[in-house]
């Protein structure tokens, strides 16, 4: 029987950094106002680089670290809500950029849950026995879709990409998962396609940008997401104290504090990096995972149990427990 495992990680963020003090120069806000409410201190902003450029850097780094060729890849999945274009897909652009001629490639759209949804999908592809190796990447350039005059959203988001190499193995590494969607609450967090106009229909300016009902999303995260994490642990062969780290979507530090209390888990087991990157949507979890490996928290030697949980637009939320 075939299984899948995460064998390598990588991440990339644009060089340009915008601090809270920088934002205070262009809108009515302050470092204290932003950081006390979100934990965010700065974010990386793409200037000339596109979503596929960021994802390509991650893909090349994964190949280099793994010492494999692009020709060894069977598939590439990119989770994003900020694609370069509707077609070709961001994943197709990455496939061309790295020369992975044998790989099929497609995008997956599930907002801040995108990486978890994509990783679950990729695990099924490899476990089927039909494929051996694939890249799963979360990549976003959210700076291009936020309204920079709206301090309620503009201060939250940043650009970046992260990803993993998934490979076939004879041992089970994916231990449990739960994925959910509630489209009836979808209007709580929206992002429309900018620049699309028709002589038969007009688009209002306020429909062109990312919008969010912050209170609704906060309540959703601490209620539904926390319960989903509990349910996933119960569906696994593990107890909560057997999980080494909880890598959650980096939306807001207060959300992480609330979830930690609901799970009765020490915050030391819930790493955070939103202070450096802000909310990078589908990229947040793989960036965090890659940084945890760099810092030596996660070993990539098959000895640790890691919980990954994403939540966001759709509304969508999903949790995976994996051996890494």
UniProtKB/Swiss-Prot annotation:
GO MF entries: 3-oxoacyl-[acyl-carrier-protein] synthase activity; beta-ketoacyl-acyl-carrier-protein synthase III activity
Organism of this sequence: Streptococcus gordonii (strain Challis / ATCC 35105 / BCRC 15272 / CH1 / DL1 / V288)
Protein name as annotated: Beta-ketoacyl-[acyl-carrier-protein] synthase III
Catalytic function, reaction form: malonyl-[ACP] + acetyl-CoA + H(+) = 3-oxobutanoyl-[ACP] + CO2 + CoA
Binding partners and assembly: Homodimer.
NCBIfam families named among the record's database cross-references: fabH (TIGR00747), PRK09352.1 (NF006829)
Top-level enzyme category: transferase
GO biological process terms held by the UniProt record: fatty acid biosynthetic process
EC nos: 2.3.1.180
Localisation per UniProt entry: Cytoplasm
Gene: fabH
GO cellular component terms, A-Z: cytoplasm
Domain of life: Bacteria
PANTHER family (UniProt xref): 3-OXOACYL-[ACYL-CARRIER-PROTEIN] SYNTHASE (PTHR43091), BETA-KETOACYL-[ACYL-CARRIER-PROTEIN] SYNTHASE III, CHLOROPLASTIC (PTHR43091:SF1)
Region described as ACP-binding: 250-254
Organismal lineage: Bacteria, Bacillati, Bacillota, Bacilli, Lactobacillales
């Amino acid at each position: 029987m075939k299984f899948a495992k995460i064998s390598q990680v990588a991440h990339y963020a644009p060089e340009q950094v915008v601090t809270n003090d920088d934002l205070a120069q262009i809108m009515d806000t302050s470092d204290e106002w932003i950081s006390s409410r979100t934990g965010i201190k700065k974010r990386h902003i793409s200037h000339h680089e596109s979503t596929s450029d960021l994802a390509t850097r991650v893909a090349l780094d994964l190949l280099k670290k793994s010492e494999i060729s692009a020709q060894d890849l069977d598939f590439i999945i990119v989770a994003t809500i900020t694609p370069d274009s509707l077609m070709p897909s961001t994943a197709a652009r990455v496939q061309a950029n790295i020369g992975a001629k044998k790989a099929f490639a497609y995008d997956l759209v599930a907002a801040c849950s995108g990486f978890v949804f994509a990783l679950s999908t990729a695990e099924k592809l490899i476990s089927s026995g039909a494929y051996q190796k694939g890249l799963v990447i979360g990549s976003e350039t959210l700076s291009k879709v936020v309204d920079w005059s709206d301090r309620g959203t503009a201060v939250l988001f940043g650009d970046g990409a992260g990803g993993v190499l998934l490979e076939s193995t004879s041992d089970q590494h994916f231990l449990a998962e739960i994925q959910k969607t509630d489209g009836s609450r979808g209007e709580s967090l929206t992002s429309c396609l900018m620049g699309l106009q028709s002589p038969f229909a007009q688009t209002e300016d306020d429909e062109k940008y990312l919008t969010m009902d912050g209170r609704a999303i906060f309540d959703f995260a601490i209620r539904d997401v926390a319960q989903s994490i509990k349910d996933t642990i119960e569906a696994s062969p593990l107890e909560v104290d057997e999980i080494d780290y909880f890598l959650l979507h980096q939306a807001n530090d207060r959300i992480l504090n609330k979830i930690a209390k609901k799970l009765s888990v020490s915050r030391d087991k819930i790493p955070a990096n939103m202070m450096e990157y802000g909310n990078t949507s589908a990229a947040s979890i793989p960036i965090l995972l890659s940084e945890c490996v760099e810092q030596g928290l996660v070993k990539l030697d098959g000895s640790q149990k890691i919980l990954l949980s994403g939540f966001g637009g759709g509304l969508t939320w999903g949790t995976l427990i994996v051996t890494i």
